[in-house]
A protein has these predicted regions:
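Flexible, active-site-adjacent loop/turn segments at secondary-structure boundaries
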Residues: 1, 38-43, 80-81
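Enriched for short, Lys/Arg-rich terminal
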Residues: 2-7, 11, 19-22, 55-61, ...
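Basic nucleic-acid-binding interfaces
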Residues: 4-8, 14, 27, 45-47, ...
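Conserved short hydrophobic interaction patches
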Residues: 27-30, 79
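A short, surface-exposed loop/turn module that caps and links secondary-structure elements
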Residues: 30-54
């Protein structure tokens, strides 16, 4: 599975604590290797086609779109803000 990150995603990621940035790298690598791993808490977003979320840390989520075999990450943030 290929992984891509938008410029917006990278800007938001850079603003997060270093520990969250490191966990994000681990979770994205895990997604590329095993999308069904239970620690990802992989979920389809109900109101959007081909849009999913994974848990980065207890309160952080990364949002991405699936296009064939590519995950395009476009949002990351605290769970209370990222779904807006």
């Amino acid at each position: 599975m290929r992984i891509e990150q938008t410029t917006r995603f990278n800007k938001h990621l850079a603003r997060l604590p270093v520990s969250v940035q490191e966990q994000c790298a681990k979770q994205i690598a895990l997604l590329a290797d095993n999308p069904r791993h239970p620690s990802l808490h992989f979920k389809k977003l109900a109101d959007r086609d081909d849009t999913y979320s994974i848990r980065i840390a207890s309160n952080y989520r990364a949002i991405f779109m699936m296009a064939h075999d590519t995950c395009i990450f476009f949002a990351i943030g605290h769970r209370k803000d990222v779904y807006r």
